[in-house]
Amino acid sequence: MAVFNKLFKRRHSVSEEIKKDDLQEEVEATETEETVEEVIEEIPEKSELELANERADEFENKYLRAHAEMQNIQRRSSEERQQLQRYRSQDLAKAILPSLDNLERALAVEGLTDDVKKGLEMTRDSLIQALKEEGVEEVEVDSFDHNFHMAVQTLPADDEHPADSIAEVFQKGYKLHERLLRPAMVVVYN
């Protein structure tokens, strides 16, 4: 019976060890499950925080872009208003230029009385002054520039008249600030 008791004790101690091991494994498994659950619970919180931060960054970027776009729109609008203001008299100037040409032709006629000539000169001068106040000026005719002159005829160049010099002006050209209203019609030495 002593052998039986030894075997029973041994078996009992082995089964207690197995139970302890099982219990330890269960405790470890439970702790691991709890830890995993805690981590899983923490992950969504971090994800929600990260998502909120990402959305905040996205909204901030959208705001900054919209703000920059508004500034660009305001700048372009201001530039357009300035351009409109600067060139507001362009159509009027183009309409007046033929009248100015007619006054020039009338003054070139021979046999005008002094009073008529003086009246035409005063009218011409007042038109020119009004156009100058709006920024309209005559195109210079020193040498030929295809940006401001239209060659209607060419003459052969010689020693006295170098190439690209202007021989005669048929019609004066005008510009409004830097914008050409009408090119000067000229005869050019070529």
UniProtKB/Swiss-Prot annotation:
Principal place of residence: cytoplasm
Signal sequence, start to end: none
Keywords from the UniProt entry: Chaperone, Cytoplasm, Stress response
Molecular function per GO: adenyl-nucleotide exchange factor activity; protein homodimerization activity; protein-folding chaperone binding; unfolded protein binding
InterPro entries: GrpE, GrpE_coiled_coil, GrpE_head
Location in the cell: Cytoplasm
Family: Belongs to the GrpE family.
Quaternary data: Homodimer.
Protein name per the record: Protein GrpE
Upper classification of the organism: Bacteria, Bacillati, Bacillota, Bacilli, Lactobacillales
